[in-house]
């Protein structure tokens, strides 16, 4: 959540490259924290609520601010994005073990942050991408639970590669890496990231 708050500050200071980098670091850190809490079996109602608040702050509010709020259309889209992230967290209970219903907010945020870095904050492209992410978050499809740090070794290598790229390579290269990673999760959820078929909702 702290990184999300820093991202918000950078966005208001019009330093979108720093704001985007904070979100990419948060994307990786979120996976590490979830793996750690699962491993040591830390789970409580308060902890779950704090986690949801952190996810909303970082991957909802901070991500939406990448769109800018100095224009009417971008401001409205930012509000819709925050609302979609909030709705997703509050009401999208999958009902199927080890799955997410709708695209998880961290992946949508990662795509927005990566796009911002690759396009140097191009508002039109960011707004188009944000519109797509809203649709994916509100989608009724199921995505596999991404236990990357508790899964096959090659997935752990993907994660380690992301950390190395983010801290030791040019931002454009690390942004491209994270973008491809997140897009692969959207378009090949089961083939690459899940062990069971990506389920469709039953009517």
Swiss-Prot record:
Localization per Swiss-Prot or TrEMBL: Membrane
Bilayer topology term: Multi-pass membrane protein
Gene symbol of the encoding locus: TMEM269
GO cellular component, one term: membrane
Residue stretches spanning the membrane: 60-80, 124-144, 157-177
UniProt keyword list: Membrane, Transmembrane, Transmembrane helix
Keyword Metal-binding attributed: no
Protein name according to UniProt: Transmembrane protein 269
Principal localisation: membrane
Top-level taxon of the source organism: Eukaryota
